[in-house]
A protein has these predicted regions:
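Single-pass membrane-anchoring alpha-helices
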Residues: 1-30
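His/Asp/Glu-enriched short active-site or ligand-binding loop at hydrolase and phosphoryl-transfer sites
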Residues: 122, 252-275, 295
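Bacterial Sec-exported substrate-binding components of ABC uptake systems
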Residues: 24-25, 31-36, 40-107, 177, ...
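Short helices/loops that flank or line small-molecule/ion binding pockets
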Residues: 149-159, 177-178, 278-287
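Extracytoplasmic substrate-binding proteins
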Residues: 78-80, 87-90, 161, 170-245, ...
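Short helix-initiation/N-cap motifs at beta->coil->alpha
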Residues: 84-86, 140-152, 271-280
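A short, structured surface patch at a secondary-structure boundary
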Residues: 97-157, 161-167, 264-267, 295
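A ligand-binding cleft/hinge motif common to bilobed small-molecule-binding domains
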Residues: 168-177, 290-310
Length: 358
């Protein structure tokens, strides 16, 4: 009996030893698994840290680009500008005192938000404000005539940027030789005017406003062009620049381009010069459907009255006269290389195809 009990105890001990050994091996396996998991976790953490490091580098690069862009948008980054005559001007800071030697440039400056920096204008700059009143109040200075203005009044204003045109090219050259920054703005097409707006916007630190303004003008132009595309005919248009010695507008002029975009046919589109002198007989022969005359600065006209036009010899046979299709337009919106050319386009389109514009 004692032997049996001894055997049983021995068997139990062996079983306990086996079970204990198995548990120890299993525990060691678990420890090994934990060590492997920890290694994997450390590798993952290393990958995450590497990724975070890359992201931090990218953020640093983005911040650097943003800072550079902010500096450029603020006008503090040096910019190089090329005007319409190929002259190069380098600006290291935004201009604070601007002189405009052309009414078109004055209009653009105020349109892009740089009007508060304009300290001098010519005596024909009349938009967007009556600058005569400003000058009398001491809030603006007159630098004299548009054609070849005197340099002395400009120097007195000590401008850091002057916007000129070919009408003031001699004064512009003198100012450049004296060390002043001068940009000559002389666009020849409507797209050229839009480029001038962007140029002036960049020069003054207002290129965001200039870009938005150009987009607005393009949208208005596209609306007109799309509308007149539905016209069933192309009316012949005569525009008289000056009289009584008749001068009209030919190729290479804003007037010719505007008439075409507005859905009309300029009867002197094929003239040999931009502003041809024409005979009354030629106008009668070309028989325009629409006649447009300008009123000039301060409302003056060179052609007299409608009765004067109607009484021109032979003009009573012209279709436009017979149909009373005679119109007057503000010369400043159709001949100035400024932002109101889009106003002229809309006006001419409505004159030529009134049925399309309700």
């Amino acid at each position: 009996m004692e032997k049996i009990i001894t055997y049983i105890v021995a068997i139990i001990a062996i079983i306990a030893l086996v079970v204990g050994s198995y548990g120890f091996v299993a525990f060691q396996g678990q420890i090994s698994d934990l060590e492997t998991s920890n290694t994997d976790l450390e590798a993952s953490m290393s990958d995450i840290q590497s990724t975070l490091s890359d992201i931090q580098v990218q953020i640093g690069e983005y911040q650097e680009n943003i800072t550079q862009l902010e500096e450029e948008l603020s006008g503090y980054k040096e910019i190089t500008l090329v005007d319409d005559l190929g002259n190069v001007v380098v600006l290291t800071e935004p201009p604070e005192r601007i002189v405009s030697l052309a009414p078109s440039n004055t209009e653009i400056l105020f349109a892009v938000g740089a009007g508060d920096k304009v300290v001098g204008v010519t005596n024909v700059c009349d938009y967007p404000y009556n600058f005569t009143a400003w000058i009398e109040a001491g809030n603006m200075s007159s630098i004299g005539p548009y054609w070849q203005p005197a340099v002395e009044p400009i120097i007195t204003l000590d401008p850091d940027l002057v916007f000129a045109s070919t009408a003031s090219e001699e004064a512009a050259e003198t100012l450049k030789n004296l060390g002043y920054n001068v940009l000559i703005v002389e666009p020849k097409t409507i797209n050229g005017v839009l480029e001038s707006i962007l140029l002036i916007g960049r020069a003054t630190g207002n290129h965001v406003e200039a870009g938005e303004f150009v987009n607005e003008i393009r949208d208005r132009m596209d609306a007109v062009i799309n509308t007149v595309a539905g016209a069933t005919s192309t009316p012949k248009v005569y525009y008289e620049v000056w009289g009584p010695d008749i001068q009209s507008a030919g190729p290479g002029t804003f007037i010719d381009e505007l008439i075409t975009l507005a859905g009309g046919e300029n009867i002197f589109h094929d003239a040999g010069t931009s502003f041809p002198m024409v005979s009354s007989e030629t106008v009668i022969m070309k028989n325009p459907d629409v006649i447009i005359f300008p009123h000039m600065y301060m409302g003056t006209v060179s052609w007299g009255t409608y009765a004067d036009i109607e009484s021109r010899p032979g003009w009573d046979s012209i279709t436009a006269i017979q149909n009373d299709n005679f119109h007057i337009i503000d010369a400043s919106i159709i001949s100035r290389s400024g932002p109101r050319l889009v106003d002229a386009l809309e006006t001419i389109a409505e004159i030529i195809n009134p049925e399309l514009f309700g």
